[in-house]
Each structure stands twice: as structure tokens, then as C-alpha cells.
Curated annotation (Swiss-Prot):
Biological process (GO), any one: queuosine biosynthetic process
Reaction equations catalysed: 7-aminomethyl-7-carbaguanosine(34) in tRNA + S-adenosyl-L-methionine = epoxyqueuosine(34) in tRNA + adenine + L-methionine + 2 H(+)
Protein species of origin: Prochlorococcus marinus subsp. pastoris (strain CCMP1986 / NIES-2087 / MED4)
Full protein name: S-adenosylmethionine:tRNA ribosyltransferase-isomerase
Gene: queA
Highest taxon, organism lineage: Bacteria
Signal sequence interval, chain numbering: none
Family matches, as InterPro entries: QueA, QueA_dom1, QueA_dom2, QueA_sf
Amino acid sequence: MNFEIHNEEIDHKLEAYDYILDETLIANKPSKVRHESRLMIVRDSSLEEDFTTNKYTKNLLDELRKGDLVVVNDTKVMKARLKVELENGKLVELLVLEKADQSTWLCLARPAKKLKINSQLNLKSSLAKDIKLHISGTDKETGGRFIKFPENINDLISMNNLLDIYGETPLPPYIKSAEEESFHENSYQTEYASNPGAVAAPTAGLHLSKSLISNLKKKGILVMPITLHVGYGTFKPIDQEDLSNLKLHKEWVRVSSEVVEEIKRVKKTDRRVIAIGTTSVRALESCYSYEMGDLIPIDKYVDLVIKPGYKFKVVDGLLTNFHLPKSSLLLLVSAMIGRERLLNLYKKAIREKFRFFSYGDAMYISPDSFLVKK
């Protein structure tokens, strides 16, 4: 089968990105050692052995060359899940997404129908005094609520400080875990997380242990950070069947001039840019200015959509997890190696009992596996 031929009509249909997964393969906790998670390595589709399944994330070291640039997302997951009390005493859950204006923040709510506009909420903690919140409006795009916090909660730093006291780790709903909150505070965070702002983890980075990062550097592989605060744009379910005009919610990205200059140096040689996670891909590809025909540093919100037919300007390889059906992340990886091939690889991963989603195993998309060779 020739996986380099896109069927654009099929590729633009959401249903084409569906697959069946046994719930027992959804990982509810990570590997005991980060770099001991299983790794599927995807190679050139023309090879007889075009993928390998008997590897571990620590074997990524063998796939990379001296001089390669590995880019990680250093965002830090905030304890963005809040349990708040309604005026009638019943509890609802908020997920703080982003600042809307001054001290008003956009939050997803569960169940949302119980949050009436202009009503009050009570935020409690055994560690601090109660805080009164006010519901000021509804967001049409997300279905979330605009919540007015105290006036001093007006930036990421102040919000993160509040969440450290009142919040909980925002685990995805498909993770059914009996572990204590303290376990997830560590395990649902990368080793290099340093910039609070995410409401979900850049999960490919969960596979990188300190020792693996150290070994990469010892081999002469550069490891540099970018920041993309993982938010609604990454995990929002796609609600349209026709993907031709798909739009994603914006996410804040920072790529420094140092990273951009190193990428330019890499591109002048036979070295490669390897992204750790789809969020790193989205950040790096957002650096390309079509007006200037060049890479530029960025510090802004981006809403780049990567789906089949997209031509990669920056990224040569990718370490990623196994993603949910019909997700924007599945579209992104399909843009690299083709939708049909990716879904066939997922079938093989399912047969071999790979673990899926945030706490699951990993896939390495090697540079020679890209549909369009660099």
C-alpha cells in the first residue's frame, strides 16, 4: 500500500480518525520508571521492517545523532481543578483555562448547567479562608463560564499561587486512579517543568527521565526548551465532521531567539530537530513566518492547525503518545506519516498491548518516516 498518497476527501472527515480501543489499554498510572515505558519506532514505510515495537523510551538515545536538537515543552501543569460550593451548598467542579480580563478567568464547569449567571460560588480549603467567586457570563466557544476572582488574582503567577492552595491536579477524565493527589502532582509533571500555565500535561515529556536527558546531552545532543501552555486547544473534542475549515482554540507560546537561532544552524547541516510532544511541534511550526519566509521568535497566542496536507517547516522527528480517537493530536501525527498508516500502526499497538493516552506508552516518528522527506 502506498501511504504517500493522500485521499484528501477522506482525510478531511472526522470519522476517518476513529478507532476502537479496549478500555483496559488506557493507562491509569505511568511506568514506574519514566524511560521504561514501551516505545514504538516508526521508520520509512518502504522498508520491510517499517516499525519496531520491542523498544523502550530509553532507546530514543540510540535513534538520535550527535548534534541533533531535541526541543521540550517546559510548561508546568497548574493545580487547575477547583471544587466550589454553590449557593445551595452543592459542589461543582471548575477547570481554570485562561485569563479573560483583569481578574476574570475562563473556566470549564461540570456540571455547567448548575452555574447560573450572576450567582456566587464559595471556594474552600482547610489551609486558608474561604474565597467568594462570581459567575459573570458564558463563553460561546467553549461553553465555559467567566468567573470573577478576587482583584489580586489577575495574572498567571497569582492564579498559580491560589491554585497551589485550593486546587487539584487536572487529570483527564479517562484516568481512573486510586492514587493520592501527591502522586499525580509529581507523575503528571515533566522533570523539566518550570513555567506554570498549563491545564494539561505535555504528556510525551513524561517519558523523559533526568538520566535519559543527561545521556542525551552526554552524546552531544542539544536539549532546549520552548513553552506552550497546554490548554483547551489541545484537548477540546472536535465537534465538526468536515475538517477542511477546522479551527482550534488559541494557546500561549514562547520560543526564544536562542532556540530559533539554533534551529537555523541545525537546518544548515544534516542535523535534525526532534520535538518532544505535539505541543512542541505546534509551537515550533508557529515560528515560521510565511511573510518573511523565515523563522522568528514568538511570545504570543497561536491557533495553528496541523492536519494532513500540512508541510512541515521546522520539525524533523517526533516523540509522542498514543492519542484519543478523533482528536486534533491524531490529525497532527497523521500529517507526518499519513492517516491510514498511523491507524494501521495503532492497530498493531493495540494487538501488542501498548498502553494508550496520557500515562501510556510512546511512539517515535523518525525523520525518514515523514511523508514529505526533508
